[in-house]
Curated annotation (Swiss-Prot):
Superkingdom of origin: Eukaryota
Higher taxonomy: Eukaryota, Metazoa, Chordata, Craniata, Vertebrata
Spans annotated as Disordered: 79-403, 418-466, 674-732
Protein name: Elongin-A
Modified residues (N6-acetyllysine): K434
Organism, scientific name: Homo sapiens (Human)
Entry text on domains: The BC-box, which mediates binding to the elongin BC complex, has the consensus sequence [APST]-L-x(3)-C-x(3)-[AILV].
Region (BC-box): 550-559
Length: 772
């Protein structure tokens, strides 16, 4: 009756909360709700939680509504929220498992969940609601909360441990077949945990005994299957499973329940370690023979070849990963045994279960063979090369072609120089590689024979080019010409001989002769690079004299470079100075002749050259030399130029002056522009330049009287425009301009003017970076 009356009161208060917006009334109703004995069933039937939760953002009542909702949330048991999480976790694990194992585990899980729901639902049935509601809520809440928390911790640990297996690079390819070992048997871990909990809580909750019996039976089956599984000689997989068992037991079992199982765990560890040590000592072929049951002779041979290839050629890390991949095989027989033990068929052999799993084993073996196939080949090649004798090492190293050109030459599409020796050796290696590939397709016994035969082939083929090279070296010194024994003079201490022209010409690359017009067209096409690099002019490359010059040649060379320094030459004949005088201009030649009158009779031919160059149409008069003709025509030309300059100057002087230059604001203050005036007013820089006024009188021009009078008229202030003495009408802070030069503020640093091209470049850069 009390529950029904509380339900009615809650419904009334809920209706009032929805209808009345007054904050005082709302607070009153919420306080009444907080005093009522509200249960989970009332919250589910009325939905008052949603109504109160809608007021959580209210200005006046929001905080009280939030507190009330938080108080009601504590009433809801954690078990209901934990079960869907557990189901999600089971789904995520079941994706990684094989389908047959998944069905078996779902059956077990369904049986277990039914018993759990049956026991758990009694406390919420309507018969027990009125009688045992208070007692059961007090007893069950701590048990369920702790149980839910511990199950969450289990899942977290599972998820923490699973990435270590999934991150393994070798086992990631087999993700569909293999599941993380730490989460392989969640029922086993859950049942162990649940049994230990129930042993502690037996006097408190009495109706959980059916679940306990079920879990004990299930645990016994699991223990039997594990003991059978221990007898099989799977060393590394069992040891790894045992380590996982150990870590899961350490994390999940409470301290009180550990004492019985510690001894069994330690004994199992010791037995597994002994087994693994014995198997490591045994040869690999025996291990493989035990693991794989006999199906047929051909399959045996193939499997042995694959295993021997793996163990010989793969590095130890890959071998370990292959052993690690065998864990699904151990897990599948275990699940098969669990299923059979349920049905009561104890006479079922383990060998038959392993025989059913043969197709899976074959698939995994083929996958293993596919993935390291490239590594096997490369390792075989390395072994064949390493097994060659040390005497042949230098020849074998030459087989791999070193880069013959620089990186720059590869970029410019230069053709590499071919070497006959290397071509022969590469053919030998190609034959060897073909032999290796053929032998790889056959059995491993033939593989090893081919590896042993390879050195002999390489020996015979490398000896032949070596003998040919020796014969070539013997022939080369016979071709060289024998130099005659000539007595050489003693070498001077300060003498440095220069290279001859013949030697320089031999170093220069000769241009390729084109055999056909098509090649000429291709060479002319700029998009294609020829054998030689593109030549770009970068100054004269010959920085030294091509050959040794005589003393006369050196003197003439110095005189040619310093003609303006030649004055009197004394008794030097014209024949010696002729090459120097040929380089002279008419003015230089005339000056040298003035100092040396003896040369005038000899230089007529030089003057003839100057006359033909400067005065092409003119001819010498009767009995007139070429020198006299040039001087006459040159004087006439200069006279004409002087007359022209006088005429032009006179014409410009008599022209009326349309525009006259006047000095503005000589004795007054110049008005600055508006923007300058505003800045002066703003910063107070107007009257700081010159405090007192100075009247400046313009200096008269030093030209004629007419110009002086005109200038004096122009510069004197007219009576219409009196001199401005007072300050400007616009501003009292304006400074008088002293001279025509612009006055600048000494506080500001002088800015260096940027060149126009540089300014343009800087502007382009700014525009470019401002867009980003």
């Amino acid at each position: 009756m009390a529950a029904e009356s509380a339900l009615q009161v809650v419904e009334k208060l809920q209706a009032r909360l929805a209808a009345n917006p007054d904050p005082k009334k709302l607070l009153k109703y919420l306080k009444k709700l907080s005093t009522l004995p509200i249960t989970v069933d009332i919250l589910a039937e009325t939905g008052v939680g949603k109504t109160v939760n809608s007021l959580r953002k209210h200005e006046h009542v929001g905080s009280f509504a939030r507190d009330l909702v938080a108080q009601w949330k504590k009433l809801v048991p954690v078990e209901r929220n934990a079960e869907p999480d557990e189901q999600d976790f089971e789904k995520s694990n079941s994706r990684k498992r094989p389908r047959d194992a998944l069905q078996k585990e779902e059956e077990m899980e369904g049986d277990y969940q039914e018993t759990w729901k049956a026991t758990g639902s009694r406390s919420y049935s309507p018969d027990h609601r009125q009688k045992k509601h208070r007692k059961l809520s007090e007893l069950e809440r701590p048990h369920k909360v702790s149980h839910g928390h511990e199950r969450r911790d289990e899942r977290k640990r599972c998820h923490r441990m699973s990435p270590t297996y999934s991150s393994d690079p070798e086992s990631s390819d087999y993700g569909h077949v293999q599941s993380p070992p730490s989460c392989t048997s969640p029922h086993q871990m859950y049942v162990d945990h649940y049994r230990s909990l129930e042993e502690d809580q037996e006097p408190i909750v009495s109706h959980q005994k059916p679940g306990k019996g079920h879990s004990n039976a299930f645990q016994d089956r699991l223990g039997a299957s594990q003991e059978r599984h221990l007898g099989e000689p799977h060393g590394k997989g069992v040891v790894s499973q045992n380590k996982e068992h150990k870590s899961s037991h350490k994390d999940k079992r409470p301290v009180d329940a550990k004492s019985d199982e510690k001894a069994s765990v330690v004994s199992r560890e010791k037995s597994h370690k002994a087994l693994s040590k014995e198997e490591n000592r045994r040869p690999p072929s025996g291990d493989n023979a035990r693991e794989k049951p006999p199906s047929s002779g051909v399959k045996k041979e193939k499997d042995r070849e694959g295993s021997s290839l793996k163990k010989k050629c793969l590095p130890p890390s890959e071998a370990a990963s292959d052993n690690h991949l065998k864990k699904p095989k151990h897990r599948d027989p275990e699940k098969a045994k669990l299923d059979k033990s349920k049905q009561g068929l104890d006479s079922f052999d383990t060998g038959k279960g392993a025989g059913d799993l043969l197709p899976k084993v074959k698939e995994k073996g083929s996958n293993n063979l596919k993935t390291p196939e490239g590594k096997v080949k490369t390792n075989l090649d390395r072994k064949s090369l390493g097994s060659l004798p040390k005497v042949e090492e230098t020849d074998m190293e030459d087989e791999f072609e070193q880069p013959t050109m620089s990186f720059e030459s590869y970029l410019s599409y230069d053709q590499p120089r071919k070497k006959k020796k290397k071509i022969v050796k590469t053919s030998a290696t190609a034959l060897g590689d073909k032999g290796l590939k053929k032998n790889d397709s056959k059995s491993t016994g033939k593989n090893l024979d081919s590896v042993q035969k390879l050195p002999k082939v390489n020996k015979t083929k490398s000896e032949k080019p070596a003998g040919a090279d020796l014969a070539k070296l013997r022939k080369v010194p016979d071709v060289l010409p024998v130099l005659p024994d000539l007595p050489l003079p003693a070498i001077q201490a300060n003498y440095r001989p220069l290279p001859s022209l013949e030697l320089i010409s031999s170093f220069q690359p000769k241009r390729k002769a084109f055999s056909s017009p098509q090649e000429e067209e291709e060479a002319g096409f700029t998009g294609r690079r020829m054998n030689s690099k593109m030549q770009v002019y970068s100054g004269s490359k010959c920085a030294y004299l091509p050959k040794m010059m005589t003393l006369h040649q050196q003197c003439i060379r110095v005189l040619k470079n310093n003609i303006d320094s030649i004055f009197e030459v004394g008794g030097v004949p014209y024949s010696v100075l002729e090459p120097v005088l040929e380089r002279c201009t008419p003015d230089q030649l005339y000056r040298i002749e003035e100092y040396n009158h003896v040369l005038i009779e000899e230089t007529d031919q030089l003057w003839k050259v100057h006359c033909h160059r400067d005065f092409k149409e003119e001819r010498p008069e009767e009995y007139e030399s070429w020198r006299e003709m040039y001087l006459r025509l040159q004087d006439a030309r200069e006279q004409r130029l002087r007359v022209l300059t006088k005429n032009i100057q006179f014409a410009h002087a008599n022209k009326p002056k349309g525009r006259q230059a006047k000095m503005a604001f000589v004795n007054s203050v110049a008005k600055p522009p508006r923007d300058v005036r505003r800045r002066q007013e703003k910063f107070g820089t107007g009257g700081a330049a010159v405090p007192e006024k100075i009247k400046i009188k313009p200096a008269p021009y030093p030209m004629g009287s007419s110009h002086a009078s005109a200038s004096s008229i122009s510069f004197n202030p007219s009576p219409e425009e009196p001199a401005y003495d007072g300050p400007s009408t616009s501003s009292a802070h304006l400074a008088p301009v002293v001279s025509s030069t612009v006055s600048y503020d000494p506080r500001k640093p002088t800015v260096k003017k940027i060149a126009p091209m540089m300014a343009k470049t800087i502007k382009a850069f700014k525009n470019r970076f401002s867009r980003r």
